[in-house]
Regions:
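Membrane-proximal helix-turn-helix segments that form the acceptor-binding/catalytic region
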Residues: 162-180
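Nucleotide-activated donor-binding/catalytic signature segment of Leloir-type glycosyltransferases, i.e.
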Residues: 270-290
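Conserved acidic donor-binding segment of nucleotide-sugar-dependent glycosyltransferases
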Residues: 339-340, 344-351, 359-365
Length: 394
């Protein structure tokens, strides 16, 4: 065996040992970083739980999921605007560190509400069940539940999904045991009474008019180069029905259309909805609530194609900005526009009717002004929160 081969082989072994050492060192460093992160997360959660115990907030409201949807906007508005001491369960800070499921699996049972506490549940069975357990342990606790939207067949493509069945079961069998039950819409109040004999108080979903008034059409135009368009805010979800908006864009090539929504792409429309997005349709991604307000301000009208809504926040935001709106003839949207007094509606599935109503909508200068007044009187959070606070005080 030559000397050069021995030298080469020795060098190869040395290099492999170095690489192995580097690999194990990186794993060691990664584990240290992970352990440090876990330590600080545990410390953060412990401090948060300690603060709840020490401060004893009057109202524990949940379940917060920290997602840009109507239910989360609703709970955050209560926290921000209520004159009472409100604590979101879990807090935004906690949800930025651990998952929703992690919190309810490992931490929710560490919260021990006092006898004078008020538990206010919304939508999510994890929190509804926890509220029920706390109420069973301590009957002096006051439990309020808000019904936002029951799950109907329109929420799925075919049979109900298992989680939708679980949510509905929780609404009917568990949330119905709350001391006070609220419905965010009149149509839903009737539905729960007639279908399940559940009595609810009507306190409408609110809209943050102050935030709506901060909308800036110029900002949106400078950012995206778009203005004077017909707007839809949606997502890839059967109940949101984005396909009909694309069909409307196809039917009105002389107008520009914008659709905003997480996961919406030309490829998605082609592959899942079997439809081609026309050239006069701009597809934008997910946006924050204030960015959506800017989009509404830059638009000439909003079109909502939803198959089902509780009481749609988006439609109320559009009305708050005095922007024309056309909605599908589903109960929640119809209630928002007072069955045509403050907006236009079309027959779901009828694109020709949708086109007719959209053309009427963009010419109307009267209904949008009245629509804002309707929002200010009934749906402005500054009005709604007083009704919620009165329930907290009873």
């Amino acid at each position: 065996m030559s000397q050069s081969f021995i030298h080469f082989f020795t060098k190869l072994i040395f290099i492999r040992k170095i690489k192995s050492g580097i690999f194990h060192f990186n794993v060691f460093v990664k584990n240290i970083k992970t352990n440090i992160q876990v330590y600080f997360i545990k410390k953060l959660i412990s401090q948060w739980l300690l603060n709840i115990k020490k401060d004893s907030p009057k109202v524990l409201i949940g379940a917060n999921v920290l997602k840009p949807n109507g239910v989360d906007f609703h709970m955050h508005a209560i926290q921000e605007l209520s004159q009472r001491d409100i604590c979101l369960i879990p807090s935004d800070t906690i949800l930025k560190k651990i998952s929703f499921n992690d919190f309810f699996k490992n931490h929710i049972d560490k919260i021990n509400p006092l006898s004078n506490s008020i538990l206010h549940s919304h939508v999510y069975p994890n929190y509804i069940n926890w509220c029920h357990e706390q109420k069973s342990k301590n009957p002096n606790i006051k439990w309020i539940h808000t019904y936002h939207a029951h799950y109907f067949p329109e929420y799925s493509e075919g049979d109900f999904l298992d989680w939708q069945k679980d949510f509905n079961k929780s609404f009917i069998e568990v949330a119905s045991k709350a001391d006070v039950k609220i419905s965010v819409s009149k149509w839903q109040q009737i539905f729960y009474k007639e279908k399940f004999n559940i009595d609810t108080l009507y306190i409408p979903n609110g809209v943050d008019v102050v935030k709506c008034d901060k909308a800036n059409a110029v900002f949106f135009y400078k950012t995206y180069g778009l203005r004077n368009f017909i707007l839809n805010v949606s997502r890839h979800d059967p109940v949101k029905n984005p396909k009909e908006f694309v069909l409307l864009a196809q039917a009105m090539p002389e107008h520009h259309f914008v659709i905003i929504g997480n996961g919406l792409t030309k490829e998605l429309f082609k592959e899942h909805y079997c439809i081609s997005a026309p050239k006069n349709l701009s597809i934008l991604g997910k946006m924050s609530q204030i960015e959506v307000q800017h989009a509404i301000a830059a638009s000439i009208c909003l079109v909502s194609n939803s198959k089902r809504e509780g009481l749609p926040t988006l439609v109320l935001e559009c009305m708050a900005q005095s922007k024309p709106v056309v909605v599908s003839n589903e109960p929640g949207s119809m209630e928002a526009i007072d069955h045509g007094k403050h907006g236009y509606f079309y027959e779901l599935g009828d694109i020709e009717d949708l086109k007719r109503q959209t053309l009427l909508t963009i010419k109307d200068t009267i209904k949008p002004i009245k629509a804002r007044q309707r929002v200010l009187e009934e749906y402005d959070w500054r009005v709604v929160i007083k009704k919620v606070d009165r329930l907290y005080d009873v």
